[in-house]
Amino acid sequence: MIRIPATRAFLPALAAGFVVFAVTLAAADVLNFPTVRADLTTEQLKRVQDITRPTTDFSKAEPYEAMESGATTSIAPVSRDIFSHPSANLGLDREQNFHLGNALFRQLWVSSPSSTQATDGLGPLFNARSCQSCHIRDGRGHPLETAGQPATSMVLRLARPAITPEEAQSLRDFKAINFPDATYGAQLQDLAVPGLAAEGKVTVSYSEETVTLKDGETVTLRKPHFGVGDLAYGPLGEATTISARVAPAMIGLGLIEAIPEADILTNADPDDKNGDGIHGRAAIVRDHRTGQIALGRFGWKAQNATVRDQVADAFSADIGISTPDRPNPYGDCTAKEPRCLTMPNGVQKRLGDTEAAGPILPLVTFYSENLAVPARRKASFPDVLHGKETFYRSGCAACHTPKFVTRDDLKDSDGKDAPQAFQLIWPYSDFLLHDMGEGLSDGQQVGVASGRDWRTPPLWGIGLTQTVSGQQAYLHDGRARTLTEAILWHGGEAERARNAFADLSTDDRQALINFLESL
């Protein structure tokens, strides 16, 4: 078992004027996680270690490199719907559930009461009417470009730090990741059902900074400044922070959940014992459904442990739909929004105790777990291989870990081997938290993550962003309009890699971008 000292996971006090408490990893000083995979024989484990070792040969593509998600990889032709295909090894018997989940993912929910009783319950406060509204064709959302427009595929998370000993203890016990605004809850909802005022509008302005690279090329970076306007229920709390979050792509989520804890934690180095300047930390959370301590993997700050938890969270916060895992039919409404709590809800007792009753949550979860990663393009092209070598040489792979092998003991609910079982995958992420510098800080604590900490996002499919979403928008708030801009925003632990990129020759820098676009 790996023992993580509690003193290595603390959050610095960032808010002046408030009693801020350190968040430790456990009251008993340590958390125990497995250090060795229990699903493999000794011989299998050695094979996995050999095949996942970083390559040193960039003269040719590695075996199976083009199949980024193993046997689940989609080899469908590139189109705007390339992120919407099922795991290639799903099988006809399970594709029916995938397509049912897809229909529910695209379903437009309506307010109550409605003649379509199985699909009512929207809101009362909400950000979008469907999952697909945020995850455009199962890809990334769009950032808000102009103040006053609905921020449909981007949300503002609201949170404050602990201000009482009891709240601090909740953080230490992982029973809370932060605390909502007293009036507006954990998220600003800029839409509402008829008869109710929306909470407010997202405002944004951008400032620009020009960066000159070593070869003389200039790149303009834009920094967003988000705020809230037209607040309907009074001001935000003085301690409330806001953080813009663009919806991420949906591909490969089931594979990410299938990576063994031990393999992720092997890359954690909170004390930087190897001296490379990288000190990735595990996100420790609770599985919302079971209440058990778990490894966070999903969300911009790795605040959710499972795909199901992520889906239930989105149903509740974004659409205002209750599920068995989050049964409140009023979503993010608070006691200071009393009219919201008197609006009709969509609970139909003959269907169940929640608005998304019966199989809805499991089907949308299954769909989300089985959106296939597309096969790579041009993996063997000389310029892409050169870019791959430059990616490694610049230090990018220190956080963007190229490959894993998923668990071999995964079963679906029907007892059959899960499609994600024992696959060699290439997500290019370590799924750990890293300090990304003040430039990307949102000042918002999320569990063991401070405002400067972000989960390393997987890079698979990143080269198809424009094709699927209709525009390029990278990083948590979509500020980066190109991959070059995204890299130049890296700071903190990633500053060395960022500077190495900025110092590359024009040809080397373009080769690295070509490599990323091939993913």
Where are these predicted regions, by residue range?
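N-terminal regions of proteins, emphasizing targeting and processing segments when present
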Residues: 8, 23-27
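Periplasmic c-type cytochrome electron-transfer domains
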Residues: 26-519
